[in-house]
C-alpha cells in the first residue's frame, strides 16, 4: 500500500544497552532514527514492529499543522471514537467547555475552554483556551493553556498593559499555530 516504511520514533531498550550506546558507542550522535538505530542494528539484535494503523509524520511545523487540521475533517483518517481502538490519555479532570453564542464548524474543541460569541472554522482548539467575542478563527491550531486565569487576574493583566491568556475581542486569525499560554 505504501512505497516505504517509516520509523515512528518509538524505541524500547534494555537500560544497560541504551546507556552503552549513548555513552560509549555514539556519544556525539544527535538522532536515533538516522544515526543510532542503523548503526546499532549492525551490532546488536534489533527488531521492528510493523504498525498498520493511523500515523502521520509531524517532524516539521507544516506537517504538524496539517496533521492537526486533518483531525477536524470529515471523514477523518483517524477516529477518536472507535471502541475497538480505545485511546488512552492523561486525566486532566477539567470541566466541559463553555460555549456561548458561537458558531463552530468542522473543528475540535478540547476540555475546559471558554468560547464567547465567536466563529471557529476548521480549527483545533486546545485545553483551557479562551476565545473572546467577535473572534474569527479559521484553519488554526490553538494549543491551549497550562492554567486558568481568573477574571480578576485577567483584569490586572490588562490594567498593567499586559496580555492575558487567550484570544481577545475583535480578532481574526487564519492559517496559524498558536502556542500554549
Curated annotation (Swiss-Prot):
| Pfam families assigned | LbH_GLGC, NTP_transferase
Q: Does the keyword Nucleus apply?
A: no
The record's keywords, sorted A to Z, are: Allosteric enzyme, Amyloplast, ATP-binding, Chloroplast, Nucleotide-binding, Nucleotidyltransferase, Plastid, Starch biosynthesis, Transferase
Q: Which reaction does this enzyme catalyse, per its entry? A: alpha-D-glucose 1-phosphate + ATP + H(+) = ADP-alpha-D-glucose + diphosphate
EC number of this enzyme: 2.7.7.27
Q: Describe activity control.
A: Highly active without 3'phosphoglycerate, and is only slightly affected by the activator 3'phosphoglycerate and inhibitor orthophosphate.
Query: Per its UniProt entry, what is the enzyme's top EC class, as one word?
Result: transferase
What InterPro entries does UniProt report for this protein, alphabetically?
ADP-Glc_PPase, ADP_Glu_pyroP_CS, NTP_transferase_dom, Nucleotide-diphossugar_trans
Domain of life of the native organism: Eukaryota
Pathway-wise, it operates in: Glycan biosynthesis; starch biosynthesis
Q: Where in the cell is it found?
A: Plastid, Chloroplast; Plastid, Amyloplast
**A Gene Ontology cellular-component term:** chloroplast
Give tissue specificity per the record: Leaves.
Q: PROSITE patterns, from UniProt?
A: ADP_GLC_PYROPHOSPH_3
Q: Does the keyword tRNA-binding apply?
A: no
- GO annotation terms (biological process): glycogen biosynthetic process; starch biosynthetic process
Q: Name one GO molecular function term.
A: ATP binding
Q: What is its main location?
A: plastid
Extract the Gene3D superfamilies matched here.
Hexapeptide repeat proteins (2.160.10.10), Spore Coat Polysaccharide Biosynthesis Protein SpsA, Chain A (3.90.550.10)
Quote the function comment for this protein: This protein plays a role in synthesis of starch. It catalyzes the synthesis of the activated glycosyl donor, ADP-glucose from Glc-1-P and ATP.
Subunit and interaction comment: Heterotetramer.
Q: Which family does it belong to?
A: Belongs to the bacterial/plant glucose-1-phosphate adenylyltransferase family.
- Tell me what this protein is called: Glucose-1-phosphate adenylyltransferase large subunit 2
Amino acid at each position: 500500500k505504501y512505497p516505504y516504511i517509516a520509523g515512528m520514533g518509538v524505541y524500547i531498550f534494555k537500560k544497560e544497552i541504551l546507556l552503552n550506546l549513548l555513552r560509549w558507542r555514539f556519544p556525539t550522535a544527535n538522532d536515533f532514527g538516522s544515526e543510532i538505530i542503523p548503526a546499532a542494528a549492525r551490532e546488536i539484535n534489533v527488531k521492528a514492529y510493523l504498525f498498520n494503523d493511523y500515523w502521520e509524520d509531524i517532524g516539521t511545523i507544516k506537517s504538524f499543522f496539517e496533521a492537526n487540521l486533518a483531525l477536524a475533517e470529515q471523514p477523518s483518517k483517524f477516529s477518536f471514537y472507535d471502541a475497538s481502538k480505545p485511546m488512552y490519555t492523561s486525566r486532566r479532570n477539567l470541566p466541559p467547555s463553555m460555549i456561548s453564542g458561537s458558531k463552530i464548524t468542522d473543528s475540535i474543541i478540547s476540555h475546559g475552554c471558554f468560547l464567547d460569541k465567536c466563529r471557529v472554522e476548521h480549527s483545533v482548539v486546545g485545553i483551557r483556551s479562551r476565545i473572546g467575542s467577535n473572534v474569527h478563527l479559521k484553519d488554526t491550531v490553538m494549543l491551549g493553556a497550562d492554567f486558568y486565569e481568573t477574571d480578576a487576574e485577567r483584569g490586572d493583566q490588562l490594567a498593567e498593559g499586559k496580555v492575558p491568556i487567550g484570544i481577545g475581542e475583535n480578532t481574526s486569525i487564519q492559517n496559524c499555530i498558536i502556542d500554549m499560554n
